[in-house]
């Protein structure tokens, strides 16, 4: 019996070694520029695409294909949809979610479309977080506001300054995508806000926080989540030295709407521009004034 047990153990160890070797052989790496997302077969000092120096790093680009929100207890990741004739598709009454911010509503084309993915870019300190937090507090809907940069106490201090109240605004300080999806499944918010996309990580990708691979994977997972649950996802993104949203340009192609928050930190006025909008015009702008209570809508700029 002891010999059989020992033999079985040896077989298990050999099989385990084969599985590990096979698994490792499937891992592929590539070199990406952390500024523009350009891909290279080997390391080099300068990026040929954007000209940045020392921004190219090696990342794992292929692992086991496991979705971040497959780890949740529900069967959300299993599609229950079937193809539907376009004439039979019924647009629900909640086609647009009103934000109680007229400037923001107009820029989006009338409000937030359920299941849509919106990306907001802008310089540090320009007011991106303030804008999204203010919308979270003004809207008459349940909002899950996730921050990977600030603690709940820090966000509460800003919320007190804004002086709007929404009992359905839930603050969650977290940067692990799996935990965020688990809470979203439990809370079932009407809107999910991520501040910021560069702070998120998923265990399905073995690379550093903010890397190109993490950015693309987390964004793809959030898009998949939004489309399957009809929960709109609003992302805040940092910008690089050229004024573009940090990371690969493909991020802007992946999302439905790209907004740019502009202004001079030494002056009070802010302009919200729309660079891309699958559900509305790109000719609208929103104008705000930064005041002690947050962002004040400027309805008539000529006054």
Regions found by a protein language model. Give the residues of each.
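Short regulatory helix/loop adjacent to the ATP-binding pocket of P-loop NTPases
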Residues: 244-253
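Short cysteine clusters
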Residues: 4, 33-36, 47-50
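Substrate-engagement module of ASCE P-loop NTPases
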Residues: 213-234, 238, 254-260, 265
């Amino acid at each position: 019996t002891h010999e059989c047990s020992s033999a079985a153990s040896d077989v298990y160890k050999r099989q385990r070694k084969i599985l590990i070797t096979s698994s490792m052989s499937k891992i592929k790496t590539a070199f990406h520029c952390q500024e523009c997302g350009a891909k290279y077969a080997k390391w080099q000092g300068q990026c040929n695409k954007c000209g940045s120096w020392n921004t190219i790093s090696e990342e794992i680009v292929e692992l086991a294909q496991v979705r971040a929100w497959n780890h949740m207890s529900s069967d959300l990741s299993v599609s229950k949809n079937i193809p539907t004739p376009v004439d039979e598709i019924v647009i629900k009454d909640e086609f647009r979610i009103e934000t109680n911010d007229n400037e923001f509503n107009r820029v989006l084309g009338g409000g937030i479309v359920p299941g849509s993915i919106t990306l907001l870019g802008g310089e540090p300190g320009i007011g991106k977080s303030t804008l999204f937090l203010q919308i979270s507090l003004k809207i008459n809907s349940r909002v899950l506001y996730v921050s990977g940069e600030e603690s709940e106490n820090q966000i509460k201090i800003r919320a007190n300054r804004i002086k709007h109240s929404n009992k359905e605004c839930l603050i969650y300080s977290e940067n692990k995508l799996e935990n965020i999806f688990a809470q979203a499944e439990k809370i079932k918010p009407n809107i999910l806000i991520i501040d910021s996309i560069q702070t998120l990580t998923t265990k399905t990708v073995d690379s550093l926080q903010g890397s190109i691979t993490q950015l693309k994977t987390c964004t793809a997972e959030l898009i998949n989540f939004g489309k399957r649950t009809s929960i709109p996802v609003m992302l805040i993104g940092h910008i690089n030295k050229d004024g573009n949203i940090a990371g690969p340009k493909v991020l802007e192609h992946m999302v439905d709407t790209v907004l740019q928050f502009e202004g001079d930190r030494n002056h009070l006025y802010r302009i919200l521009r729309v660079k891309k909008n699958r559900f509305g015009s790109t000719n609208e702008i929103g104008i705000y004034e930064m005041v002690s209570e947050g962002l004040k809508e400027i309805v008539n700029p000529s006054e």
